[in-house]
Swiss-Prot record:
InterPro entries named in the record: Ferrochelatase (IPR001015), Ferrochelatase_C (IPR033644), Ferrochelatase_N (IPR033659)
Species this protein is from: Allorhizobium ampelinum (strain ATCC BAA-846 / DSM 112012 / S4) (Agrobacterium vitis (strain S4))
Alphabetic keyword roster: Cytoplasm, Heme biosynthesis, Iron, Lyase, Metal-binding, Porphyrin biosynthesis
CDD domains: Ferrochelatase_C, Ferrochelatase_N
Subcellular localization, as worded in the UniProt entry: Cytoplasm
Pathway assignment: Porphyrin-containing compound metabolism; protoheme biosynthesis; protoheme from protoporphyrin-IX: step 1/1
Any single GO BP term: heme biosynthetic process
Alphabetized GO MF terms: ferrochelatase activity; metal ion binding
Function field: Catalyzes the ferrous insertion into protoporphyrin IX.
Protein name (Swiss-Prot/TrEMBL): Ferrochelatase
Keyword Lyase tagged: yes
Length: 344
């Protein structure tokens, strides 16, 4: 490298090169729980055509006339209940940053690899971190959307945004995207370990465990989105790894939004029905979420637990996401090392 630099003309701008970037990307987070921060975040999120596939002529009047005037306050209150007050940020941001920092440490045997992190919506943006990696000398970037199961509304929109960032670059790094890893044995083992460890910490045994995945509209599935199948495959492999009968572990879908039908069974309706049918003890895990966030901490640990208890259930426990735990990092590192093959 020094020989190449020595042959550059004196007036040549400084050029960094020879590095490989790894960019971890999660969904996103507001900068704060106030109305303005929430509205800015929701506007970016809900304006994405991958998330809401309705006609803009139909959707924008609803978004700007109703949703962005009513939802920021409600969602802000929900975020405030699970906010990381010590760092004044969402736990999703905390965990994603921790994952990137720990990943960098675990890859010290690859000195030319630079690890960074970004959010699809909010800050730090994908473009800002890709620009930073390129300026740091990364001629190749491994883009890692932190979603074990592929969906157009999650993985694809991260890829879209990354390729959009390339449009602004004169010297474009080579870009490689990480595929889904819903059936990765290391991932399945980590989920099984987390379930077994959590249940061992309880003084009661759940009658069944729900694996609650984020839902998508049924219409997206009918158009060819593989997400539904990959969620069920993860659930099946996890149940087999645990050695449980079919009735012990159930796949459900949460977080539906709007009037159309989403993937079923719905998590909230399921926990209510289970309680009314006489089930007294359940636990819920969120295999599709790499990190705990609003949808796991508030919607499941909070709301779903309340629904279960109000309907007659007695014991409810939420199993934390893998986050930046040793098992969680082992999963991410395994994927990164595999996808970096041929580059480092």
């Amino acid at each position: 490298m020094s020989a190449i630099v020595n042959h550059l003309p004196s007036e040549h701008p400084k050029v960094n090169f020879g590095k490989v970037g790894v960019l971890l990307v999660n969904l996103g987070t507001p900068d704060g729980t106030d109305y303005t921060s929430m509205r800015r975040y929701l506007r970016e999120f809900l304006s994405d055509k991958r998330v809401i596939e309705w006609s803009r002529l139909f959707w924008y009047p609803i978004l700007y006339g109703i949703v962005l005037n009513t939802r920021p306050g409600k969602v802000g209150k929900a975020y405030a209940e699970i906010w990381n007050n010590d760092l004044n940020e969402s736990y999703l941001r905390t965990y994603t940053r921790n994952q990137a920092e720990k990943m960098a440490v675990s890859l010290t045997d690859m000195p030319n690899v630079v690890v960074d992190w970004a959010m699809r919506y909010g800050q730090p943006s994908i473009k800002s971190r890709m620009d930073a990696l390129q300026k740091a000398g990364c001629e190749k970037i491994l883009l890692f959307p932190l979603y074990p199961q592929y969906a157009a509304a999650t993985t694809a929109t991260v890829n879209d945004e990354a390729f959009k960032a390339l449009l602004k670059m004169r010297w474009q790094p080579a870009l490689r995207t990480v595929p889904q890893y819903s059936d990765d044995p290391v991932y399945i083992d980590a989920l099984a370990n987390s379930i077994e460890a959590h249940l061992a910490s309880l003084d009661w045994e759940p009658e069944l465990v729900l694996t609650s995945f984020h839902g998508i509209p049924k219409s997206y599935f009918m158009k060819g989105d593989p997400y539904h199948c990959q969620c069920y495959k993860t659930g099946r492999l996890l149940r087999e790894r645990l050695g449980w009968p079919k009735e012990k572990l159930m796949v459900t879908f949460q977080s539906r939004f709007g009037p159309e039908e989403w993937l079923q069974p719905y998590t909230d309706k399921t926990v209510e029905k289970l309680a009314k049918d006489g089930v007294k003890r359940i636990a819920v895990i969120n295999p599709g979420f790499v990190s705990d966030c609003l949808e796991t901490l508030e919607e499941i640990a909070g709301e779903a637990g309340e629904i279960f208890h109000h309907a007659g259930g007695e014991k409810f426990s939420h199993i934390p996401c893998l986050n930046d735990s040793p098992d969680g990092m082992r999963v991410l590192e395994n994927v990164v090392r595999r996808e970096l093959q041929g580059w480092v």
